[in-house]
Amino acid sequence: MKIAFIGAGSIGFTRRLLADILSVKELQNVEIAFTDINPRNLDMVTQLCQRDIDSNGLSIKILSTLDRREAFRGAKYVISCVRIGMLEAFTKDIEVPLRYGVDQCVGDTLCAGGIMYAQRDIAAFRDFCKDIREVADPNCLLLNYSNPCAMVTWYCNTYGKVKTVGLCHGVQGGHHLIAKALGYEQKDIDIICAGINHMTWYISVKHNGEDLNYKLLDALKADPDIARTEKVRIDMMKHFGYFSTESNGHLSEYVPWYRKHTENIHKYIDLGVWINGETGGYLRVCTEGRNWFETDFPNWLKEPPYEYKEEKRSGEHGGRIIEALETGRVYRGHFNVINDGAITNLPDDCVVEVPGYVDKNGISIPKVGDLPLGCAACCMSNVSVQRLAVHAALEGDITLLRQAMLLDPLVGAACEPDAIYQMTDELLIEEAEWLPQYAQEIERAKARIEKAKADGTFIPPIVTQGAARLHTKTVEEMMLDREAAKNNAQEADKAKKRT
């Protein structure tokens, strides 16, 4: 059996997820393939992971290749952790909208950054899915960790014709936070979540069968750390009655209220940790983390290798799903799948995040029923944008792309329509190398920008670093505190629990 990783150069995540898989005795003789477009990152992650494998006494030899089809050939599972455009495109996702007053913390799920990320991803996943269909195992399952998770998963299932499950750790992180607030161990709190990726709602929170949702808001407010760092999530629960899975910074981007006035952003965020709302926080951490890893890599090779043990596995779903499908050991988690009636008051064709069970028979999704109306309405505001963005990406349809931007909750709150049109043109121009489906529209966008500058209708950019921007440290600055630099770099690791 073969498992292929695409975007394997996502070093911390690939290494941790591989350890999760190879900690399962029945999976210790699988074939492993890594592929990436960055040869240096691919080489570094291969060195680290092969050393881990060897130190655990396994005979696996990683196939490390720049040839995607070679990696996919015969694979029963493909795990995606790609970032199309890498940090160069990510920087544009944050900086261009900021010139129009759109202040993002993460920018990888919705808002202007998430919409553009989907345009790049879908252009690339068109080829990925084609390769999977042509050379992978006929029953290959794509486990997608790439953001924007919902839109990529929507495309791959519906248009790429590859069975795909989107995976995220937001549910697990919020579960930990809820247990902490209520004064219990996480294992003693039973939760059910339903919604859409990064806006999933804890619709059931129980301890020994007792519903504790009525206690949760007061418990969250009473915890000094949570009250300081999760102001948006607490305020959303006050208005909608249920706690949301995603972090303060993430959630602040998916609704129109918390980031539209730059002078008020500090009221709702905390700068202690990037994910609590810092302007461009995830970009800063990813940039510092990449630069630090490239500098500090020789020291990583001197550290003890990972031990492949059950008790050291992470909370990520990927390894558990493969284990359940291959061994029959039942796994319960929350997964991103085509709705198909699971949540009855969201569209059947959208991607929802809901409970699921996995065993040798496959992945089974129970019927959740209706979400509370207010929660469903919040989700629908995002689903409508996702639908427009996915369809825009299919053929490079600028009309649908503009409409996605117009209807995005934060973009629409921060900008007038003319500014949104101009911002969209600038994003297309600056990200042209990753958007082949927009080639003709990009030339038209250039002409519109030139005409606007010539006739005086060009909207001048806002000169700002954002309402809550922190300095991106140089390698030299990070070297002054190596331990802090390493810890900060790990904040960009998808496998790290952030609560």
Regions found by a protein language model. Give the residues of each.
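Gly/Ser/Thr-rich loops at beta-strand to alpha-helix junctions
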Residues: 8-13, 39-41, 86, 144-152, ...
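Short acidic low-complexity segments
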Residues: 61-74
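N-terminal Rossmann-like dinucleotide-binding module
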Residues: 3-32
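Hydrophobic or amphipathic alpha-helical targeting/insertion segments
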Residues: 74-82
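Rossmann-fold NAD(P)-binding glycine/threonine-rich loop
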Residues: 88-159
